[in-house]
């Protein structure tokens, strides 16, 4: 599921099961995994993008309740007060290997006074990008995401709904600022830069319940990528898991699986 009330994405290969973010309670996480015929004990580790509660608020509970290792950068780990014995720090742009068939690259992105990162996961010669909570992007991010077979990215708000909505000006300014979130138009422009003929699927995530709507996100993004993308575009809901995308060798059971999105 993705949204302001919690975020988590499952990456599954034949030899690894990894969560990207854990913003749910332990009970909620267990319920959502059960819908995939999984338990928390099946999870090998959790990667955290940044310390905000809807992304990392449930990270410590997986350590204390199920002894699941968590990987985060140092600031994120300290902000979340993670259990030292079950925490591994990573550095931006240092490739992290999980088992023998999954590699995860953290790529820095700007967001609200946090050391936020996107992740580019590699399996079977193909790549999946998970990008959330950023108000702008860098050439570095474009370079690492371009040509990924799957891209999961936030489309947080519709500009008009945000600006004419009930939020105070200070909050509107923060959301729409360079360290805030991506609008539907920004997401469309970013995707137009990174989509290639190899890009098969896109998932739009983290839609604001007050400042966006699925049909607005989809139509706006498609306007920008219609000439460069012919694959599968889906929108992730807060109450997921909804669906899966597969990346990697066709013989693999589920090389990249994002049903918690």
Model region roles, listed by residue range:
Residues 72-125:
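Metallo-beta-lactamase
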Residues 20-23, 44-51, 71-74, 129-132, ...:
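Active-site neighborhood of phospho(di)ester-bond hydrolases with catalytic His/Asp-centered motifs
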Residues 52-56, 77-79, 114, 136-139, ...:
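Active-site environment of divalent metal-dependent phosphoester hydrolases
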Residues 57-66, 77, 81-82, 212-219:
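Metal-dependent catalytic neighborhoods of phosphoester/phosphodiester hydrolases
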């Amino acid at each position: 599921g993705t949204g302001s009330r919690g975020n988590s994405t499952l990456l599954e290969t034949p030899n690894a099961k990894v969560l990207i973010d854990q913003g749910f309670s332990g009970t909620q996480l267990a319920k959502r995994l059960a819908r995939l015929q999984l338990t928390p004990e099946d999870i090998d580790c959790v990667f955290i993008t940044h310390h905000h509660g809807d992304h990392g608020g449930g990270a410590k509970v997986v350590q204390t309740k199920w002894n699941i290792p968590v990987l985060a950068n140092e600031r994120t780990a300290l902000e979340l007060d993670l259990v030292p014995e079950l925490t591994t720090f990573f550095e931006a742009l240092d490739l992290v290997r999980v088992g023998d068939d999954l590699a995860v690259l953290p790529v820095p992105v700007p967001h609200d006074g946090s050391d936020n990162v996107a992740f580019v996961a590699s399996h079977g010669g193909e790549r999946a990008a998970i990008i959330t909570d950023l108000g702008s992007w860098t050439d570095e991010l474009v370079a690492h995401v371009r040509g990924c077979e799957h891209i999961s990215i936030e489309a947080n708000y519709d500009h008009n709904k945000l600006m004419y909505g009930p939020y105070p000006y200070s909050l509107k300014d923060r959301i729409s600022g360079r360290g805030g979130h991506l609008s539907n138009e920004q997401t469309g422009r970013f995707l137009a830069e990174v989509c290639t003929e190899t890009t098969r699927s896109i998932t739009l995530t983290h839609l604001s319940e007050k400042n966006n709507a699925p049909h607005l996100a989809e139509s706006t993004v498609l306007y920008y990528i219609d000439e460069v993308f012919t694959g599968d575009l889906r929108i992730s809901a807060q109450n997921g898991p909804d669906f899966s995308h597969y990346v990697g060798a066709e013989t693999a059971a589920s090389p990249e699986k994002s049903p918690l999105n």
